[in-house]
């Protein structure tokens, strides 16, 4: 029977509707204007959404475990997440459905299983023998709270301590409770009426499995005999207990207490401890007890054959060490090493050579789980150096403020970045290899290079190799190195927009082919970087200062006497070119003492040594104007072929030629409209005209005379007489407004900076991103007033390309497309010098084209298709080393520039069209060029808004991918905008997701799922099918090490380890059944059926088909064997029956 496919039905419906709409459009247009039919290859079956991998440090860690045979590390978190680490490149992420905090983890050593205890009193058994671990069993305690668990090595019985002081025993194979229970009132002294507190420790004697050591929080320790069901010894101490550890010989144990002391006890001497140690306490001269210290939260005792044992502990510092960082103390013989940590210690484990507790442990390393880091300390080398961590756990080293994802990069890019990044690695690491090396890598078919770039709050930019679902840091760039550090708070307040993180990265623009990098920072600064493998010494850092503010000047100000610069109407049929002009850049203050012409950050004026990697090409800063700080940059684009960078904010747009170090364009948003402004807006402030900006700043000029009325304001001098008192009142009012405006501007900037920092905090959407008042609700109302539109119109999208700009154009030309938050798209044409020799000698002419397109909602992304529907990538300059000794002359360098145009338009016929794909918060449009008619239109969402939209390549075609605020991920075919995928994935819960979600080619996407973790996902069916093969394996068959030899005399005199038949002791036959109301067993999806259900897509179907086929084949084989046996038996029976018949056929009845 043929399988019914609902997707093909939907494709037929959508294709039918799209064809109907196309027919309607064709009826509306004459035959000569019909759009050529483009064959689209993408269908619904090419898309499927699934998570792939999660990278980064586990957010809010709470538990730690290690399998010493499999060499696998497990970390649990407060959000119920489970992260497993093997060799570098082998990682796994799991999530408990309840989301409760993980309080403890226990490996079934070398069994491929893990037990997790959660704060909701549930135990889970995880199966690690599959690439995606799943829960086999769960056990929910109903009447008691779980506080501690202990699973002896090579045992299937799990001891579970509770808050009431009782201990229950669970069979880990069936996850059922045993009837054997250790009650707290039987464990303590019968004469004692006080409750000993929750169970904080359980462990069996290394030499006698029948003796169980139980530690209660109040300070009581009990050695329980499992066979006789009574307490052998009871040890009491005045201070509360936090942890207990055995000596491997089973004759002594050590306890850590809340007063910072360690007590060592002999098993057979319960009266008092053999020794009391206060590691960090001051020893008093008169022999009195040392002063109490902070609690020792955990202690471990590990022995060696060749020397003194190691005592390792966390906490216990003296109370007078105020401000001291958390420490891990390693005591070995007479030496004590205090190792300071950067963050609070959550847990630690000592890695030993043997898994057997009754043998010399021979510790070789300590794993320290910190609040925001994972540290591995080498115990075998002097000074206890740390191992170099190969996992990508430093994503959050500084809070992530933005990120970009690039798939299918040039193949030589990752080796180039790795080579320059390898020089940045610090020294002093342990010389040994990383000891956590379990598991095996996956065998994925995905081979194209992938790079992730993250921008951080401290101004750093990190490049990551993300190929084949792994992550490895390649290179780190510190953008703050070009700026002077503010020495005192007063200087910082004079210029900074924000009080903290003035170097935070907001936008990243990167050209992988040319390796040019451009970043925009929170202090309204832009830095352009060029990649070089040579070290250079920059004598003077090139810089430009730009005044990006549109205001009209008063006549009575000194600056007002100069003729103001004029703007060209955008809608003019003959737009005038914009010649470059040069103006001196001087920092000054206005006549009323307001800060003016001063950037927020100060560039270093001393020579700067730039290491191989990304080196500063140009620094651009927006300056203060009339006491008001510059607005933060909202959009950024760079083109290496043109040598241009453009950026915009809520005031306007500026274009810079970074080859000539000149400003080509400086327009306000209103000036982009010219006479075509549909809102008839006037400049927002009638006080100041725009002053000449930094070196190389250009203003638009036109040949007509400017009316004088345009230069005047209501408060300027005019023919009407004004009373001096009225003027004074007006001036006072203006000063108050300016003061309040400055305060408000800085307050808003601080709020934006704090919002960027909140990417590192688990904030909820409701207090910080209100549904009705947030930065993403710019265009959700169709009835926005002109004042509201004016206050909200910001440059939101920029794109360089060679397109058919005007309706009369017959050949494409370089241009810049500009999108704003009110849904308007402008086109600015670029007239480049004819050859590379003239590039530095002649200016780039910039002029508005007059083309204006409108959409509903803020424009997010723009791209272009050729007549065949292929994506037209912007032109670029191939990378070439610039810092070569024989090429010091700038003109010689420029002659060797070979810009490459990857646009297919050069090979097109003149009559062929292009398509402009424009995506806004609400809708997407495909405009036919040069006619500028709407070929296709799709309303993406009515009730929500698009957060991120990207035009991406997939399966030799292109599509539009969108992520909406309501959690839907959608894809549309191009150019017809036919819906292909619409899946509810993730609701917008905080600004972190909104700021970091991005799509990449080949069906890849990512976002910052927590302040420390990146979640990658795919919307490609092919990747989903191959994902199972790409994932690494956690469990590998390894032989368990041999048990330690007991020795002749120990075996003869009974000095060796005593075994215990736990099955006989805890089984149902001897201990009975546990109460059903005590705990509830919940079967998990991770068994044989769970393994079948865990697989997804075609791989899962094939796996199930193979499994069913194997089972059917096995059954058929068994049936065949049974049938053959029955046939053989039948033949034998027939033969014997025939012989009997021949024997007795001639005999009479009386002869028998």
From Swiss-Prot:
- Residue spans with biased composition (Low complexity)? 17-28, 713-722
Q: Where is this region: Disordered?
A: 14-35, 555-596, 675-731, 883-907
Q: Provide the GO biological process annotations.
A: axonogenesis; exocytosis; positive regulation of exocytosis; protein transport; regulation of exocytosis; regulation of synaptic vesicle exocytosis; regulation of synaptic vesicle priming
Domain called v-SNARE coiled-coil homology: residue spans? 1087-1147
Gene Ontology CC: one annotated term: secretory granule
What Pfam families is this protein classified in? Answer: Lgl_C, LLGL, WD40
Q: Which residues carry this modification: Phosphoserine?
A: 693, 724, 760, 783, 786, 901, 903, 1059, 1132
Q: How does it sit in the membrane?
A: Peripheral membrane protein
GO terms for MF: syntaxin binding; syntaxin-1 binding
Q: Which InterPro entries does its entry note? A: Lethal2_giant (IPR000664), Lgl_C_dom (IPR013905), LLGL2 (IPR013577), V_SNARE_CC (IPR042855), WD40/YVTN_repeat-like_dom_sf (IPR015943), WD40_repeat_dom_sf (IPR036322), WD40_rpt (IPR001680)
User: In which ranges do the WD repeats occur?
Assistant: 62-95, 102-141, 146-182, 201-235, 241-273, 295-337, 345-379, 401-478, 506-620, 634-696, 795-852, 861-935, 940-984, 998-1021
Homology family: Belongs to the WD repeat L(2)GL family.
The function of this protein is: Plays a regulatory role in calcium-dependent exocytosis and neurotransmitter release. Inhibits membrane fusion between transport vesicles and the plasma membrane. May modulate the assembly of trans-SNARE complexes between transport vesicles and the plasma membrane. Competes with STXBP1 for STX1 binding. Inhibits translocation of GLUT4 from intracellular vesicles to the plasma membrane.
Q: How does it assemble?
A: Part of a complex that contains STX1, STXBP5, SNAP25 and SYT1. Interacts with STX1A and STX4A via its v-SNARE homology domain. Part of a complex that contains STXBP5, STX4A and SNAP23.
User: PANTHER family of this UniProt entry?
Assistant: LETHAL 2 GIANT LARVAE PROTEIN, SYNTAXIN-BINDING PROTEIN 5
Name of this protein: Syntaxin-binding protein 5
